């Protein structure tokens, strides 16, 4: 028996040594390098093909959004009268993400203090506190019925929680979805039974909550997937099968959730695409990138119809009062050349981190790395205001589904609810 055991141990050691030989490790490293080289080659080829397609589209594109709206009257500063009526205080660390409920009565927030909180949007009072299974949260979501909430982040998992009406401080875990091999950057409920996840492993996934399993994987991206967007359906607990994704590969993809391949794609630029939002009618989409540009695409014409640039936004407002980029103060004296010379280096480092539209679609709210939340006139491509007041970096902006308020979240651990300040 002893001899047999010794033989077994010797055999086991020989097998182990076989699999950890330096040559084998070198082979594995070589295979990994080969895969990365193939991915990079595919990226470059894809960019070249998209450049040819965009060139052909540009030849037949007869107008842009700004050209068509040339005769529309510009908005003035006095039209943007949003005031921070409610400040939501309760978190002890940075606000990672937040969402409005479908009926606009609640706000779900997730923080790196290890909690998700549900707030009454009318009073600013806390309704529920949900301890997270991981404090390294990057995204949160609330179901259309507001009975489920979800969190995801650096632990590579998406956790679904039931919202309890009896126990206001509880961790009622319904499901934990595991399968991504890298961090989860964004999540969205498509309805009360399904949730989408976007991950740094270059894939998106659709999960069935009642069955607790993955339904489908979407893998067209060649870089980290950084954000998701779904068309708004404010009066329904069901949504369409359409969703969009964007990532570090510079692409925005439009998907039919029933198909594993994208139905439409737009090459934005070489920067990371951090923010994505559908226009109110669901027929256009905007993508915000690390280089500070916001591009709007029309799904029907399959092309870009507008680009919102901080340089253009400031310069276009020269005949009327404008906001200076250096300190965002209201000013009427400086010329376009002066503005450009004093702010160019500052504007170069302003990546877009969040986007949303007003209920009418005339205004677009965009959060930049250091500038904060800027308000755009969508039809004119001009900056018409700024939501100021946070003591730290503004990380997100979302308008309520009913259109009556806007919420901003910040690294100062607070959120502010903005609504019209009528006198």
From Swiss-Prot:
- Biological process terms in GO annotation: chemotropism; establishment of protein localization to plasma membrane; G protein-coupled receptor signaling pathway; invasive growth in response to glucose limitation; pheromone-dependent signal transduction involved in conjugation with cellular fusion; protein localization to mating projection tip; regulation of pheromone-dependent signal transduction involved in conjugation with cellular fusion; response to pheromone triggering conjugation with cellular fusion
Family the UniProt entry places it in: Belongs to the WD repeat G protein beta family.
Pinpoint the residue ranges of every WD repeat in the record.
Answer: 90-120, 132-162, 179-208, 220-256, 268-298, 348-377, 389-419
GO CC annotation: Cdc24p-Far1p-Gbetagamma complex; cell cortex; cytoplasm; G-protein beta/gamma-subunit complex; heterotrimeric G-protein complex; mating projection; plasma membrane
Question: What species does this protein belong to?
Answer: Saccharomyces cerevisiae (strain ATCC 204508 / S288c) (Baker's yeast)
Concerning SUPFAM superfamilies, the annotation shows: WD40 repeat-like (SSF50978)
- Gene Ontology terms for molecular function: G-protein alpha-subunit binding; G-protein gamma-subunit binding; protein kinase binding; scaffold protein binding; signaling receptor complex adaptor activity; small GTPase binding
Print the keywords alphabetically: Pheromone response, Repeat, Transducer, WD repeat
Q: How does it assemble?
A: G proteins are composed of 3 units, alpha, beta and gamma. The beta-gamma subunit complex (STE4-STE18 complex) interacts with PLP1 and PLP2. Interacts with SYG1.
Q: What does this protein do?
A: Implicated in the a- and alpha-factor response pathway. The beta and gamma chains of the putative yeast mating response pathway G protein play a positive role in initiation of the mating response. The beta and gamma chains are required for the GTPase activity, for replacement of GDP by GTP, and for G protein-effector interaction.
PROSITE patterns assigned to the protein according to its UniProt record, in alphabetical order: WD_REPEATS_1, WD_REPEATS_2, WD_REPEATS_REGION
- What broad taxonomic lineage does this protein's source fall under? Eukaryota, Fungi, Dikarya, Ascomycota, Saccharomycotina
Q: What else is known?
A: Present with 2050 molecules/cell in log phase SD medium.
Report the domain of life of the source organism. Answer: Eukaryota
Listed as disulfide-bonded, the cysteine pairs are: none
> What is this protein's record name?
Guanine nucleotide-binding protein subunit beta
